[in-house]
Amino acid sequence: FPHEEIIEEGEYSDDTQLILCLSRSLQKGERWWEHFTQVELPFWSVYERGGGGATKRAVESWLDGVMPWSSSRKPQDVKRYYDAGGNGVAMRSLPHVLRLGEMEFSKVATNIFLDGIATHGHPRALLGALAYGFALWAAFRKDSKLAYGELVEELIKNVDLWSALPATPSIPSEWRSQAEKSLQDYMKLW
């Protein structure tokens, strides 16, 4: 039920809560995604405040021990997951950039993407997070003052870099097949 959530000074919003969930997960090293999806997201449901519908639905799925895109879920639930295009993924980009900022963006992009599919399936959410992540990555690599519009120019100049669907074996194969099934021409939308 919709309601207004008052967040007092010193308290955390859902975005800050999820950034902290992700940050704790990243401390687990290579197994960060498993920790994020199996521990942090399910536990977040106990104390969340103001989380978006897509994230809450994905968390319910993780609580059931099922990936949000799993073919074992109701088709309408999987479709709803792939229709989810909010900004929650973008809000969680910063920890990946801070952790991997010295590396090539492709590594950062892979982590942002894997983080994103934990809660959202639509290209709008995932590409938005990759664009924002690239802007953060580019800004942190600068050792001089940013000029007005410089990050926008960097995004435009490097669109092929940040907008590519990460090519990694880490992406569950069922995620790809369900994406095409749920959103016809997923890659065209991408």
Describe the residue ranges of each PLM region:
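Structured, active/binding-site neighborhoods that engage oxygen-rich ligands
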Residues: F1-W190
